[in-house]
């Protein structure tokens, strides 16, 4: 639990049942730790502030962690120079604080463009001096920010074309189709429906590799539902 996990780690034990842990602050700060902890149960953790701060050797797969309750990632990977693992599938819907999250994380350059940032209210210095990071963040929901946060990506590789579109929230879309078995023969006609979370002001286009490129979809009953 919260009162014993730090002591267990200090004693060299990481084979822990972490189900009761809700706070994971500072556990590996300024350490040489680099052991597998991808199996930890983080489903009840709400804060991971400074978790790997200055943990310059850590580079383990933690992409399977359930972080759906985590609200704060303040300085979680700050100066964790070696970390570059795929965490694209993390459920960040509860996240509110990304202050200095990847600050000085020199090697990190993973695709996190699909993260849900709709509840985030702090992104100051999130990628400050993250010298390798240059992923497309234009799909992030950043309606809580009227302008770029302070030092968001100063001295980082992130280009202006990959930065979030401040003050906007990209629409989400669900795709469904009429092909039940994923096998299409020459005589089959498959209908693909795109359902957006809001009405679209412009006509969406669809790309299917090897089949169609930027083909306009057809409006359905509302401007939020489109068909191809």
Predicted regions located by residue number:
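Negatively charged
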Residues: 1-170
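Non-catalytic beta-sheet/beta-sandwich ligand-binding modules that flank or precede catalytic cores
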Residues: 170-228
């Amino acid at each position: 639990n919260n009162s014993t996990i730090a002591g267990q780690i200090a004693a060299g034990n990481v084979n822990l049942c972490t189900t009761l842990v809700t706070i994971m602050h500072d556990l590996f700060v300024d350490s040489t730790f680099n052991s597998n902890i991808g199996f930890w149960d983080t489903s009840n953790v709400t804060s991971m502030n400074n978790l790997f701060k200055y943990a310059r050797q850590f580079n383990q797969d933690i992409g399977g962690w359930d972080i759906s309750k985590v609200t704060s990632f303040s300085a979680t990977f700050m100066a964790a120079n070696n970390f570059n693992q795929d965490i694209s599938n993390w459920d960040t819907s509860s996240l509110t604080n990304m202050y200095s999250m990847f600050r000085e994380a020199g090697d990190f350059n993973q695709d996190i463009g699909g993260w849900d940032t709709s509840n985030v209210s702090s992104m100051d210095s999130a990628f400050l001096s993250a010298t390798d990071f240059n992923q497309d963040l234009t799909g992030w929901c950043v309606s809580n920010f009227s302008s770029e946060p302070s030092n968001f990506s100063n001295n980082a590789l992130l280009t202006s074309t990959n930065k979030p579109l401040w003050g906007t929230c990209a629409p989400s879309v669900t795709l469904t189709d009429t092909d039940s078995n994923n096998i299409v023969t020459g005589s089959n006609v498959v209908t693909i429906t795109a359902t957006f979370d809001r009405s679209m002001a412009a006509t969406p286009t669809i790309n299917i590799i090897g089949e169609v490129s930027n083909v306009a979809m057809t409006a359905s009953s509302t401007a939020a539902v489109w068909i191809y």
